Every structure is written in C-alpha cells, then in structure tokens.
C-alpha cells in the first residue's frame, strides 16, 4: 500500500466529480471529530467529510463526517487500494460514508439512483481515476464496508479534548 500512497501523493490529483479531493496531510483541515493520530489524505470537498488513516489502526481508511448524527468516524476500507476500488464501484465517494448508516435495501436504492444519473463528465473522471491508479471496482461495496464495521472496535479511537468539549461529555 505504501507504493499506492506514494503514487497518490505524487499525483496530487483531484477528482471533484467523484468527490475525491487531494489533501496534503500536514496541511489538511481537521475538525473536532478528527481522531488523534489521523493522517488526512483526501476530502469530499464539502460538508467537512474527509478520509484518513489513524496511526493506531494501521492502513485502515476512515471517513470522518462532522455533520453526522450517528457517529462521526466510520471505518470504510482495509487500505487505500480497497478505498479506491469502492470509489470505482460506487462512481464516487458520495455514498461511501452512508453505507454504515443504511440498511442494505436503502443503500442499494440510493446507489441505483446515483448510477442512473451518471453523466459524461463523471464517466470521464472515473476512467481517468481507474487508469491512473490501476483500480478494479469492488463487487460488493456494502458487504465490504459492513464487514469492516464488524471487525473494527471504534471505541478504541482516541479523540481530542475539543471533541469532548464540543459534545459536552466527560472523557473516561
């Protein structure tokens, strides 16, 4: 995976239509809910949604969603290659952070609607993305993300003092 991260950091490519904006790790904006030890490498470019690895979780990719009502941090891929394959299958990041929140049938309906509105710009950007990084689309995105949800103990994620202050809760 280090080679894929190296290529990604070298290319610094943005795929705005796919909802993938390159973020320089040492300059990326972090939010109250960004985990301690997070290395932000990309964002959706809206809503504060960003993607990171967390030092204590190895190569696992997390989505951080500051305006979510059902938690703020979701593991979504085992590594960068899987993250990219999910983006390819879903034709963007727009539904990726929603998978943990939706029952499968609702997710599949949302995906069907999303794919039905694919325009030439999105198709061209997706082709460029898959070619640039040698991406093969994931065949079971819902199961991939949900299986990871069951593997990762998110209670082990460490948050900053600001996180607890914003939420008005005491740190254990």
Residue map of PLM features:
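A surface-exposed partner-binding patch
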Residues: 1-69, 114-172
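Compact, glycine/acidic-enriched structural inserts
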Residues: 62-103
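Hydrophobic alpha-helical interaction segments
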Residues: 95-116, 122
């Amino acid at each position: 995976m280090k080679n894929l991260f190296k290529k990604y950091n070298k290319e610094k490519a943005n795929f705005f239509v796919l909802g993938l904006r390159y973020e320089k790790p040492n300059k990326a904006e972090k939010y109250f809910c960004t985990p301690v030890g997070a290395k932000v490498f990309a964002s959706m470019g809206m809503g504060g949604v960003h993607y990171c690895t967390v030092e204590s979780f190895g190569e696992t990719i997390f989505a951080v969603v500051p305006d979510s009502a059902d938690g703020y941090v979701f593991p979504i891929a085992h590594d960068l290659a899987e993250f990219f394959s999910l983006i390819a299958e879903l034709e963007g990041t727009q539904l990726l952070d929603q998978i943990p929140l939706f029952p499968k049938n609702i997710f599949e309906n949302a995906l069907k609607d999303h794919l039905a509105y694919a325009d030439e710009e999105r198709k061209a950007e997706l082709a460029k993305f898959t070619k640039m990084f040698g991406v093969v689309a994931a065949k079971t995105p819902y199961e991939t993300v949900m299986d990871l949800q069951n593997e990762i103990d998110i209670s082990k994620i460490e948050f900053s003092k600001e996180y607890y202050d914003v939420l008005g809760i005491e740190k254990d």
